[in-house]
From Swiss-Prot:
This is UPF0304 protein YfbU. Pfam families: YfbU. InterPro entries: UPF0304_YfbU, YfbU_alpha-helical_sf, YfbU_helix-hairpin_sf. Belongs to the UPF0304 family.
Amino acid sequence: MEMTNAQRLILSNQYKMMTMLDPANAERYRRLQTIIERGYGLQMRELDREFGELKEETCRTIIDIMEMYHALHVSWSNLQDQQSIDERRVTFLGFDAATEARYLGYVRFMVNVEGRYTHFDAGTHGFYAQTPMWEKYQRMLNVWHACPRQYHLSANEINQIINA
């Protein structure tokens, strides 16, 4: 992240104020203030993650993924024979924190801040799937979008989606 000295000074002052406003996280803010003041390039890259950007198209895709899981669970709940499909297979897992952190952050934002999909079970890890999921979800979306009744899926359609 490239910043002018004036921008670094402003951000440093912001971190200084945050140490006073949020004592529970004061140590973290002091560390970030030191990094900014001294211009430690390697550590300043951490700020890129904090100030990252998620394109509108990606946000819409993540919402589409969450909506697909909502439809899967509703459809599964309406099945006569729910035993044929394990409920865990139609439960949204989330994303991998190591490789998909921005996606994971957006899911948490949507649920915890925006109040959408609050019925999803975050588990003990808060939608941390512990394995990369993006490509799997893309395959699932392709199958789901091809279904004529996306919110009234048959057991066969549910299986096709979750096995994509």
